[in-house]
Amino acid sequence: MSVRRASTVALLALSGLLPACAPRATQPPPPPPAAAERVGVVYREPADPAHRKILEEARGQRFLERVAEVLGVVQLPKPLTLSLSSCDGTANAWYDPERGTVTLCYEYLAEFRQLAAAAHLEGAEARDAANGPAVFVLLHESGHAVFDLLQVPILGQEEDAADTFATVLLLKLGRDVAFHVLRGAAWSYGQQAAVRTLGEGDFADQHGLDAQRYYNLFCLAYGSDPKYFAPAVQKYHLPEDRAEGCREEYHQALFAVQKLIAPSIDPRALERLRVKHGGAWDLGR
């Protein structure tokens, strides 16, 4: 969940109070930061010694740097920092507009790993279940940051929009990385949906229900390439009547990203990213 953007709302309200005859600024606004300066990373020392291994593996995989590299193609007007931190025992992640940070908690990563271990998964499925949710959550919270910093208008729940942003971004990075990350993220939502007893708070929450998020991820993936993502229907139980409309859902989401966010993408930074990774960008799975 993103922190409320009170300061942004206040600035917009104040701007409406300025007199129409106010003189124009004599200096042009400062240019946005260069790609390398747009998104920084911080690995904070974990408070719990049991999380030390998570820190070492994340650093070794350059986990935050890989995500920052992708977000860096967006010409954000202010720097953004991705932080891996301890959160007083709480498994969470959030965007803080006042500090310009996206925080991912060690406790959250530990929870993903515990869920995967308890399911006794093997091979790629085990790696995806442990790593996919972490990547997806970080991109989801970064979506809140992009919406805030670019002043992206949102029709509907911002949490749904952040899920869509993360999913479309992954799909545009490449089918392979998207398959593994989205499979892991959806698996996590499916596991939580299976064990949670729903109450009034779940239905009133800003976030969609875990089961809804599970199907939404697979629907967008399937809609982007029904042949490649056929397992969404064949193995992961996306209902056929929902699957029939997923192509349209994906293109609707892609159109929104192209209209609202793509104009802020730095084409040179994007090309450097493509050349560097040769279309096989890997999020450290």
PLM regions and their residue ranges:
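C-terminal motif of bacterial Sec signal peptides marking the signal peptidase cleavage site
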Residues: 18-20
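Short pre-active-site segment immediately N-terminal to the catalytic Zn-binding motif
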Residues: 115-136, 150-154
